Every structure is written in structure tokens, then in C-alpha cells.
Swiss-Prot record:
The keyword Cytoplasm applies. GO terms for cellular component: cytoplasm. Pfam families: HCS_D2 (PF22617), HMGL-like (PF00682), LeuA_dimer (PF08502). Mn(2+) binds at residues 13, 201, 203, 237. CDD domains: DRE_TIM_IPMS. SMART domains: LeuA_dimer. Keywords: Amino-acid biosynthesis, Branched-chain amino acid biosynthesis, Cytoplasm, Leucine biosynthesis, Manganese, Metal-binding, Transferase. One of its GO terms (molecular function) is acetyl-CoA C-acetyltransferase activity. This is 2-isopropylmalate synthase. Residues 390-515 are annotated as: Regulatory domain.
Length: 515
């Protein structure tokens, strides 16, 4: 049985989704969960593109030791130098260099001939080799490139030292039959191809990213580049959860082994959704809310009698658990910590105490608390950053004949309490206006505001996801509570704290290209 490596690019290509911007601490939280899942490679960013990306790659490479950490670089010496500077303290760092190879890119973007592109690619791989032997080379827009040119190019860069050859469908143009044939033809026509891993990186513009990646595996590819929830530029990338579960569920057909812990999928998906602010559509394969739901009476009856009549996967395989009652107001610290550990979370003592306090508050409002609600509380604290402001007091007055008004008190770092009372178009707007008055940030715009019910019932936990734009940078805030007005205030305040504590520049530079 063969094996396929999983190369995750959520933190690089995934972050290029419109409106997504992650601070380094959030990227590290995602990287840690990817490591728990045992992906083979984590592409942590594009170091030369911004100070924030550089910092994120540096932090991740220093903290994640059991997984290869990669950084992207154009075929330019300054890009490669910057990538290595960020990676140098990692365990087994990978430099991922790329250059465009399609006629349209070479003519209009690069203004280079085929031979000039080959020379630049070879020079880049040789230059990267002075830092590490772990080098991946990508031919950007390979699916629209001339195959014979790709054969020549790949043979040369392999001789120069590349250990992985990546074949991207950069604009999502390919269909499975032709993409599979491209991989097969490359294997048959590049004389030294057996010296390297063959990787594919498919975009989803025609909804075929997963299908194209699987076609590539059938024809000899042994690395697939993916993103959690399929996020990425335009229509996104190959979805990590779909590829892994397709190979796992249909191992009888593909005869491929995977090393990933599938039970981490649900938590990873939720974490990425919370931090990016990109909600998961209910009918999304594998991780959507409806993925294991059955409305039809015939289907329900069949599943009750025998699950496999209508379910090809067990929900527990991806880490979903029955929504059973687990804890209540009489549960103590020991039981609560033990339960969190059983869920797979590794939390320091200070964070544990904060979560335990929130749990006790929730237990006073609800008789029974499910593991889903406990995980939502953990998500409130699981990714940490410095808090310039903390909510101390909130009061909202609203009604159909009353001008909505919110009174807010915030504690600052030095414990000075600042207060403001503002009106708005509704209670949430009034809360946001009051916070704005205290923090004094003029250039702040609300991009999106979402409320989701974590559980059912009148005492359900409400999850609020807020996205703001502050000085051209986008920030996402998340909070889950039974009181959605308080959750709204906390989520909004989180975006402001991220802005105030963020030291990196998030503006996209001309270096932000993709493969």
C-alpha cells in the first residue's frame, strides 16, 4: 500500500481568502492543531510579503518540531534569504520556490522566454540549496503550461537539487481526466522524476479541486496540497478534510495509506472557521452541520436500524461526539480538567482557570452542559493575545419605542475604567458605538456580523463572529455565551485588541502572488 503526504497551506494560500487576516498567535494555534492531526508539512507563510508573515513563519518553525514547516519564496535571492531567515531555527525546514510557466504568464507577467524561466528556476533551487536540501519547486499555472516545456524544466530543477516537484492547477482550469494525464505524462517523460516526490496544488474555480487531486493520486502523485475547509483565493483550494476522508473511506479503491489522525478534523475545521470568520456552509462535505443529518423518514428509519444503510462514514471518525449531557453546576475543577483532557485539549493552568470560571457562570444559567458548549467556551480562550481593553460592565436599554442605548465600562491595561454611553440603530450597534467612543479609533468599519446557535433550546449558547476593518487591515473576533449582547461586545472588542497589540503590517505587497 502506498502513502500520500498531506501538505497544508491554510496559513499561506488559505489566508489569501478575501477578508481573512490572521495574527501570528492565531496562526500558531492553527499550526498546533495541524500538528496534532499529524499533517506532513505546514506551509506557514510567505515571509517576504509582510513583517506579519515573517513573524508567523518564524514562530511556527520554532514551536512546531514534529512536522516539516515550509515557507514560500519566488525565484529570487532576496525571497529565499528572507524565507530561510524565518525558517532557520526549525526542525526540518522546507523552502518552497516557484515561478510561472504558462505562456500567458511568461509573456505578460514575467516577460521572459522559456529558457530564461528555466535558468531562473535552476538558479533559485541551487541558491536555496546552500541553506537546506529540503527544497520544493512549483511551476505556477502548470495546468496551462506546455507539457514538453514542463518536462525540460522539471528535469533541470531536479538536477539542481529539488526534492519535491509541485504541479499546480493555479486557476482551477483543469478537469480530472486531463489533469491525471498530465501527472502520468510527467512521470513518463521526466527521466529523473523517480528522485522526487510529485505534489499537486489544485484550486476550486470549477469545483473540481478534490476530484483533480484524487485523479493525480491515481496517476502517481504522492503529495497533495490542501487547506482546511477548502479556503483560499477566489473559490478556494483542495479541502483537507475531503481529501483525507476520501482516501480513508475509499482505501479499498485507492490502496493508499494516510498517517493523519482523522479524529482531529472537526476541531480543526471549527478552529479555522472561528479564527478566519469564514462560516462553514451547512451542506459542506465532512464538516458541515448537515453532513451527518437525515431529514427523510426513510433515511432516518434506515440509520436507526443500521447506520451504514445511509452513512458511509462514522461521525466519530472525524471527532464528532454524541451531544450527551456531561457536566453541571456541581462539577469540580478535577472533573472539568479531566474532561477537557479527554477532549484532547492541552491548556495551561492560567487559561484553565479562566475557562473554569466561564463554565461555572454558564452552569448557573443552564442545568445541563454538553461537550459542544464546553468546546465553545474553550474556543473563547484557546487562542491568546494581549488584551489592551477588557469588558467590565455592560447595560443595554432597547425596545420598539425606545432609542437603543448601551452603557459600557472597559478596563484598560493599567486598570483605569473608562465609561461611555451611546445610542445606535439597534442594541448591537449601540454597543459598538460605545466601545468606539472609549477606544478612540476613528477608522474602524464593521465588515460582517454573524450569530450561530451552538446548541438547541431557549438557553442555547450563542456564538458571535465579528469581522472589522481597521486602517486597511481585517480582524476577526469570536465569543460564545448565553447572552448574545455580551458575546457581541466581547467579539467586537477582540478585533480591537488584536489591532492594538498587532505589531505587524497586514497590507498586501506586490510580492503576494500565489501558486
Amino acid at each position: 500500500m502506498g502513502e500520500v503526504k498531506i501538505f497544508d497551506t491554510t496559513l499561506r494560500d488559505g489566508e489569501q481568502s478575501p477578508g481573512v487576516s490572521l495574527i501570528p498567535e492565531e496562526k500558531l494555534a492553527i499550526a498546533k492543531q495541524l500538528a496534532r492531526m499529524k499533517v506532513d508539512v505546514i506551509e506557514a507563510g510567505f515571509p517576504i510579503s509582510s513583517p506579519g508573515d515573517f513573524e508567523a513563519v518564524q514562530i511556527i518553525s520554532e514551536n512546531i518540531r514534529d512536522v516539516e514547516v515550509a515557507a514560500l519564496a519566488r525565484s529570487r535571492k532576496k525571497d529565499i534569504d528572507r524565507a530561510w531567515e524565518a525558517l532557520r531555527n526549525g526542525g526540518d525546514p522546507r523552502i518552497h520556490v516557484f515561478i510561472a510557466t504558462s505562456p500567458i504568464h511568461m509573456k505578460y507577467k514575467l516577460k521572459l522566454s522559456e529558457e530564461q524561466v528555466i535558468e531562473k528556476a535552476v538558479e533559485a533551487v541551487k541558491y536555496a540549496s546552500k541553506y537546506t536540501s529540503n527544497i520544493e519547486f512549483s511551476a505556477e499555472d502548470a495546468s496551462r503550461s506546455q507539457p514538453v516545456f514542463l518536462y525540460r524544466l522539471f528535469e533541470r530543477v531536479i538536477n539542481a537539487g529539488a526534492k519535491v516537484i509541485n504541479i499546480p492547477d493555479t486557476v482551477g482550469y483543469a478537469i480530472p481526466e486531463e489533469f491525471g494525464k498530465l501527472i502520468r505524462d510527467i512521470k513518463e517523460n521526466v527521466s529523473n522524476i523517480d528522485k522526487v516526490d510529485i505534489s499537486v496544488h489544485c484550486h476550486n474555480d470549477l469545483g473540481l479541486a478534490v476530484a483533480n487531486s484524487l485523479a493525480a493520486v491515481e496517476n502517481g502523485a504522492n503529495q497533495i496540497e490542501v487547506a482546511v475547509n477548502g479556503i483560499g483565493e477566489r473559490a478556494g483550494n483542495t479541502a483537507l478534510e475531503e481529501i483525507i476522508m476520501a482516501l480513508y473511506t475509499r482505501k479499498d479503491f485507492y490502496n493508499i495509506g494516510i498517517n493523519q489522525d482523522t479524529t482531529q478534523i472537526a476541531r480543526l475545521s471549527k478552529l479555522v472557521s472561528n479564527l478566519t470568520g469564514m462560516t462553514i456552509q451547512p451542506n459542506k462535505a465532512i464538516v458541515g452541520a448537515n453532513a451527518f443529518a437525515h431529514e427523510s423518514g426513510i433515511h432516518q428509519d434506515g440509520v436507526i436500524k443500521e447506520r451504514t444503510t445511509y452513512e458511509i462514514m462514522d461521525a466519530r471518525t472525524i471527532g464528532l461526539k454524541d451531544n450527551k449531557l456531561v457536566l453541571g453546576k456541581h462539577s469540580g475543577r478535577h472533573a472539568f480538567r479531566e474532561f477537557i483532557q479527554k477532549l484532547g485539549y492541552d491548556i495551561d493552568d492560567e487559561t484553565f482557570e479562566e475557562i473554569f470560571i466561564e463554565f461555572k457562570k454558564l452552569a448557573d444559567k443552564k442545568k445541563n452542559i454538553t461537550h459542544v458548549e464546553i468546546e465553545a467556551l474553550i474556543d473563547n480562550h484557546y487562542h491568546t493575545f494581549d488584551k489592551v481593553y477588557e469588558l467590565d460592565y455592560l447595560s443595554v436599554n432597547t425596545g420598539n419605542k425606545v432609542l437603543p442605548t448601551a452603557t459600557i465600562k472597559l478596563k484598560k491595561e493599567n486598570n483605569i475604567i473608562e465609561k461611555a454611553a451611546c445610542s445606535g440603530d439597534g442594541p448591537v450597534d449601540a454597543i459598538f458605538q460605545a466601545i468606539n467612543e472609549i477606544v478612540g479609533i476613528d477608522d474602524i468599519k464593521l465588515i460582517s456580523y454573524h450569530i450561530n446557535a451552538v446548541t438547541e433550546g431557549k438557553d442555547a449558547l450563542g456564538e458571535v463572529i465579528v469581522k472589522t476593518k481597521i486602517e486597511d487591515n481585517t480582524y476577526t473576533g469570536h465569543s460564545a455565551m448565553t447572552d448574545i449582547t455580551e458575546a457581541s461586545a466581547l467579539a467586537y472588542l477582540e478585533t480591537i485588541n488584536k489591532f492594538l497589540t498587532s505589531e505587524q503590517t497586514r497590507q498586501t505587497t506586490s510580492a503576494q502572488e500565489g501558486i
